[in-house]
């Protein structure tokens, strides 16, 4: 195996990413080297491409980016015992310390020392990515490669949707991006009664309809209260999944929640936006922030959803070779795509 590889690198502090030749990561005793077969573009990667304020504060340059992927193990460290060369795998993109209180209590997703693959350390937009053995997840044979490549965002959807009991509940999802759509599908499959998803992007609303979500609402043209009446809802929503990061959508969600309702918040909202806290208080709402995936309960659940017949393939709207990465980023930046999966092989 050569000691150099192709990778998408943030080589300069400006808009864009560049295909470069960089050294293959060195494998430590507890590490696993993975030959990447497919990788997907995340919203985080778009922030890095755009070199916005968050990226400028967060991303060291140069940096190999990307964290949504699947591949095959190419090499294992001398102390690795649970994985072997040739195994199909994906990986948890949050590297946790294992030493803090939350890690020691089995709550690694709450680690205050988390490092992000493709953010704080070299990522998976490359021919090879190196992860600690702890972070590597075996992919069963009945899970397709391209679906395994989007397990990171699917995990965000599963973690958010399953934060609260959904059986018999009416669920509102704000934001029909890929994660919002997958969250709505999980809610529907987990026993929710009514599942309503809102957005203002016609392409994403059409994608939500294509995937079989029953109640798809264009918030720019339809009044949510009217929709609720038309589908027989006499009270507010029991569970809210905020996936949009849009202040108007979040405010509308709070307004439409039933007393005692529960909201899981994944969408990253603009700093300092206002909500009516009196409604939160007098409705006795429960608000819960969501970041990443539970380690590794979320991974087991999302594998089970796929093995149980949940078809996520339509969420992937663009399948391209890695040399066309600019086209993939253009699709993501336009807002008129679902998931974009890039083939490295």
Swiss-Prot record:
<comment type="similarity">
    <text>Belongs to the zinc-containing alcohol dehydrogenase family.</text>
</comment>
<feature type="site" description="Important for catalytic activity for the proton relay mechanism but does not participate directly in the coordination of zinc atom">
    <location>
        <position position="152"/>
    </location>
</feature>
<comment type="pathway">
    <text>Amino-acid degradation; L-threonine degradation via oxydo-reductase pathway; glycine from L-threonine: step 1/2.</text>
</comment>
<feature type="active site" description="Charge relay system">
    <location>
        <position position="47"/>
    </location>
</feature>
<dbReference type="Pfam" id="PF00107">
    <property type="entry name" value="ADH_zinc_N"/>
</dbReference>
<feature type="binding site">
    <location>
        <position position="97"/>
    </location>
    <ligand>
        <name>Zn(2+) 2</name>
    </ligand>
</feature>
<feature type="active site" description="Charge relay system">
    <location>
        <position position="44"/>
    </location>
</feature>
<dbReference type="InterPro" id="IPR011032">
    <property type="entry name" value="GroES-like_sf"/>
</dbReference>
<comment type="subunit">
    <text>Homotetramer.</text>
</comment>
<dbReference type="InterPro" id="IPR050129">
    <property type="entry name" value="Zn_alcohol_dh"/>
</dbReference>
<dbReference type="InterPro" id="IPR013154">
    <property type="entry name" value="ADH-like_N"/>
</dbReference>
<protein>
    <recommendedName>
        <fullName>L-threonine 3-dehydrogenase</fullName>
        <ecNumber>1.1.1.103</ecNumber>
    </recommendedName>
</protein>
<dbReference type="InterPro" id="IPR020843">
    <property type="entry name" value="PKS_ER"/>
</dbReference>
<feature type="binding site">
    <location>
        <position position="199"/>
    </location>
    <ligand>
        <name>NAD(+)</name>
    </ligand>
</feature>
<dbReference type="InterPro" id="IPR004627">
    <property type="entry name" value="L-Threonine_3-DHase"/>
</dbReference>
<dbReference type="GO" id="GO:0005737">
    <property type="term" value="C:cytoplasm"/>
</dbReference>
<feature type="binding site">
    <location>
        <position position="42"/>
    </location>
    <ligand>
        <name>Zn(2+) 1</name>
    </ligand>
</feature>
<feature type="binding site">
    <location>
        <position position="204"/>
    </location>
    <ligand>
        <name>NAD(+)</name>
    </ligand>
</feature>
<keyword id="KW-0560">Oxidoreductase</keyword>
<keyword id="KW-0862">Zinc</keyword>
<dbReference type="InterPro" id="IPR036291">
    <property type="entry name" value="NAD(P)-bd_dom_sf"/>
</dbReference>
<keyword id="KW-0520">NAD</keyword>
<feature type="binding site">
    <location>
        <position position="103"/>
    </location>
    <ligand>
        <name>Zn(2+) 2</name>
    </ligand>
</feature>
<feature type="binding site">
    <location>
        <position position="100"/>
    </location>
    <ligand>
        <name>Zn(2+) 2</name>
    </ligand>
</feature>
<dbReference type="Pfam" id="PF08240">
    <property type="entry name" value="ADH_N"/>
</dbReference>
<dbReference type="GO" id="GO:0019518">
    <property type="term" value="P:L-threonine catabolic process to glycine"/>
</dbReference>
<feature type="binding site">
    <location>
        <position position="179"/>
    </location>
    <ligand>
        <name>NAD(+)</name>
    </ligand>
</feature>
<dbReference type="GO" id="GO:0008270">
    <property type="term" value="F:zinc ion binding"/>
</dbReference>
<feature type="binding site">
    <location>
        <position position="68"/>
    </location>
    <ligand>
        <name>Zn(2+) 1</name>
    </ligand>
</feature>
<dbReference type="GO" id="GO:0008743">
    <property type="term" value="F:L-threonine 3-dehydrogenase activity"/>
</dbReference>
<feature type="binding site">
    <location>
        <position position="111"/>
    </location>
    <ligand>
        <name>Zn(2+) 2</name>
    </ligand>
</feature>
<feature type="binding site">
    <location>
        <begin position="290"/>
        <end position="291"/>
    </location>
    <ligand>
        <name>NAD(+)</name>
    </ligand>
</feature>
<dbReference type="InterPro" id="IPR013149">
    <property type="entry name" value="ADH-like_C"/>
</dbReference>
<feature type="binding site">
    <location>
        <begin position="266"/>
        <end position="268"/>
    </location>
    <ligand>
        <name>NAD(+)</name>
    </ligand>
</feature>
<feature type="binding site">
    <location>
        <position position="67"/>
    </location>
    <ligand>
        <name>Zn(2+) 1</name>
    </ligand>
</feature>
<dbReference type="InterPro" id="IPR002328">
    <property type="entry name" value="ADH_Zn_CS"/>
</dbReference>
<comment type="function">
    <text>Catalyzes the NAD(+)-dependent oxidation of L-threonine to 2-amino-3-ketobutyrate.</text>
</comment>
<keyword id="KW-0479">Metal-binding</keyword>
<keyword id="KW-0963">Cytoplasm</keyword>
């Amino acid at each position: 195996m050569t000691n150099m590889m192709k990778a998408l690198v943030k080589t300069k502090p400006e808009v864009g990413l560049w295909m470069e030749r960089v050294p293959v990561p060195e494998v430590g005793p507890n590490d696993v080297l993975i030959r990447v077969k497919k990788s997907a573009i995340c919203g985080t990667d778009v922030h890095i491409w755009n070199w916005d304020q968050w990226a400028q504060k967060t991303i060291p340059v140069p940096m190999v980016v990307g964290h949504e992927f699947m591949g095959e193990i190419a090499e294992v460290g001398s102390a690795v015992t649970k994985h072997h060369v040739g195994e199909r795998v994906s990986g948890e993109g949050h590297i946790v310390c294992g030493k803090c209180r939350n890690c020691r209590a089995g709550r690694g997703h709450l680690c205050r020392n988390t490092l992000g693959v493709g953010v704080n350390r070299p990522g998976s937009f490359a021919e090879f990515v190196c992860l600690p053995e702890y972070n590597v997840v075996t992919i069963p044979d009945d899970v397709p490669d391209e679906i395994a490549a989007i397990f990171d965002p699917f995990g965000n959807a599963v973690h958010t949707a399953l934060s609260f009991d959904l059986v018999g509940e009416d669920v509102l999802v704000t934001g029909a991006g890929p994660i919002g759509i997958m969250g709505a599908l999980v809610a529907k499959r987990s026993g929710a009664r009514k599942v309503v998803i809102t957005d203002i992007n016609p392409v994403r609303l059409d994608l939500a309809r294509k995937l079989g979500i029953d109640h798809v609402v264009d918030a720019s043209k339809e009044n949510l209260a009217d929709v609720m009446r038309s589908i027989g809802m006499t009270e507010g929503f029991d569970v809210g999944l905020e996936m949009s990061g849009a202040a108007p959508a979040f405010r509308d969600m709070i307004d439409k929640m039933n007393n005692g309702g529960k909201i899981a918040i994944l969408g990253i909202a603009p700093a300092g936006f206002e909500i009516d806290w009196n409604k939160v208080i007098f409705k006795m709402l429960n608000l819960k922030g969501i970041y990443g995936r539970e380690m590794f309960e979320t991974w087991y659940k999302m594998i089970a959803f796929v093995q149980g017949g949940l078809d996520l393939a339509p969420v992937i709207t663009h399948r391209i070779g890695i040399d066309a990465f600019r086209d993939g980023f253009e699709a993501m930046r336009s807002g008129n795509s679902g998931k974009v999966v890039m083939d490295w092989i």
